Amino acid sequence: MLTGVARRGKGCSKFNGDNFLISRLDCGKTTAAIADGMGSGKRAFIESRMVIELMENCIDAGFDEHAALDLINAAYIAGGSKSVNPVTMDMSVIDCNTGIMSCIKMGAAATFIKRDSSVEVIKSTTLPLGVLEKVDYERVNKKLYNGDYVIMVSDGLLDNIPNVDKEKILSLIHISEP
């Protein structure tokens, strides 16, 4: 499995409110996650980085994704609603042995699966971390096949391509083999 990441701060800011995690587990699974802090700048960066670091610690400790999200949400809320802003979480856990991807979304932007010239969109209407005491997320399982591309993005990218059929653009992209 090949992975790649690109990010950029808003405007001239050296801070980006998005942070990410890619973790390969011994059991043949790979976890990819994007946390997006509300707003932009240093505060959004710090808050999303905290969520990603907590997720990484939970994964390293052997927590499953449900327990990890419950723990992270509880810790985030314990910080106090006046001291933190909500953070979106987009997480995909891919079992490289079976090809099953479990996509978990909490207020996150769409995820795209590109297969040949078609694009499947996974959307969610859930709330971000830190809004409700009980974790609000949607989980969708998808079968991936050799040659598929999973494209996870934050709302910052999608917001900067207004009035365009994003699925159509992604279907036209040709991704070269390494």
PLM features per residue range, with description:
Residues S13-D26, V87-M89, I122-N163:
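Acidic loop->beta-strand submotif enriched in PP2C/PPM serine/threonine phosphatases
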Residues M1-M38, R43, R49-E53, Y137-V140:
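N-terminal entry segment of metal-dependent catalytic domains or homologous docking segments
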Residues M1-V5, I173-P178:
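Short intrinsically disordered, low-complexity coil segments enriched in acidic
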Residues M1-D18, N73-G79, A109-N141:
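PP2C/PPM family metal-dependent serine/threonine protein phosphatase catalytic domain
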Residues M1, F45-D116:
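Catalytic core of PPM/PP2C metal-dependent serine/threonine phosphatase domains
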Residues R43-A44, S102, F112-K114, E120-K123, ...:
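Extended hydrophobic-aromatic, low-complexity segments
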Residues G39-A61, D148-S176:
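Active-site-proximal, acidic helix/loop segment immediately C-terminal to a metal-coordinating Asp/Glu
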Residues T30-A33, C103, V150-V153:
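Short hydrophobic-aromatic micro-motifs
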